[in-house]
Amino acid sequence: MAVFTAVTEAQLADWMRHYDLGEVVEFRGITSGIENSNFFLTTTRGEYVLTIFEKLTAQQLPFYLDLMRHLASHRVPVPDPMPRDDGALFGMLNGKPATIVTKLDGAPELAPGAAHCVEVGQMLARLHLAGRDFAHHQPNLRSLPWWQETVPSIAPFLSDARRTLLTEELAHQQAFFASADYASLPGGPCHCDLFRDNVLFAHAAPGTHHEVELGGFFDFYFAGCDKWLFDVAVTVNDWCVDLATGKLDEARVEAMLRAYQTVRPFTPAEARHWGDMLRAGAYRFWVSRLYDFHMPRAAELLKPHDPGHFERILRERLAGAAL
């Protein structure tokens, strides 16, 4: 279980004086937090989530919160940070930066079908287009430079076969990233972590033609500016796979890509390099999971994710399983 930063009633009351959100009705911790301390907050004005950032600093937060605010203003269903009385989107609570955002409706769908993939694909394309005029730029902090920095530190922990795969794929990605085709790929703000547990689905309204209804995307704290195709590949590698084998499910892949491209069609270069980007998306999470597994942070109480899952996905993509 995650360790939370406790908030007393007196601290909450003092904190809420800086917001025009009404009176507090209910306040309770969310025990599933991993990176941050999260609390459900109900007031006389509505339902919100209060987040205390355990790792991100006050200097790092503006990109993420401003991006969420920008997307919400463009009718992309994301948590909308609430401004304080001084206009800031966060303040300090118990010595740590904290924010209040709107609460999305729905629950994650951990066994998605094609209908869920359609909704996610369409909204991801809308998110990409909505971010085109976002004023700030921050690169995806878990892209090639981080891989190059991290691989030498984790390679000694691996078997010869895994170390060979790790270094050979890094060489392939370095060449891909240096190519003229890669430079031509369109991009902008990306979620970069749009897994099944970062999307909510609400019950479809009676009388609508939707089988499912998207509640929204959340957890933007790995977001960054990258090639849009990378964001699509990361999403497909989670939403459209058999979790036991890493194999792609053709029906779900087709549903997601067709839906995405009804909003933003791929360029010819994107179509040519879809397989390379599926590999890049798998590699990014294999590297980060290897790092978390073999080099855990001090006082980390959470069990790290299995690195083998994304190793299987990468090997599947290398074997030509990309559809």
Curated annotation (Swiss-Prot):
Enzyme nomenclature, EC number: 2.7.1.39
Catalyzed chemical reaction(s): L-homoserine + ATP = O-phospho-L-homoserine + ADP + H(+)
Keyword terms of this UniProt record: Amino-acid biosynthesis, ATP-binding, Kinase, Nucleotide-binding, Threonine biosynthesis, Transferase
Enzyme class: transferase
MF terms (GO), sorted A to Z: ATP binding; homoserine kinase activity
A Pfam family annotated for this UniProt entry: APH
Cystines in this chain: none
Pathway the protein takes part in: Amino-acid biosynthesis; L-threonine biosynthesis; L-threonine from L-aspartate: step 4/5
InterPro entries from the UniProt entry: Aminoglycoside_PTrfase (IPR002575), Homoserine_kinase_II (IPR005280), Kinase-like_dom_sf (IPR011009), Pseudomonas-type_ThrB (IPR050249)
Keyword Amino-acid biosynthesis attached: yes
Keyword Methyltransferase in annotation: no
BP term (GO), one: threonine biosynthetic process
Record family assignment: Belongs to the pseudomonas-type ThrB family.
PANTHER family: AMINOGLYCOSIDE PHOSPHOTRANSFERASE DOMAIN-CONTAINING PROTEIN, AMINOGLYCOSIDE PHOSPHOTRANSFERASE DOMAIN-CONTAINING PROTEIN-RELATED
Cited HAMAP family: Homoser_kinase_2
NCBIfam families: PRK05231.1, thrB_alt
Protein name, UniProt field: Homoserine kinase
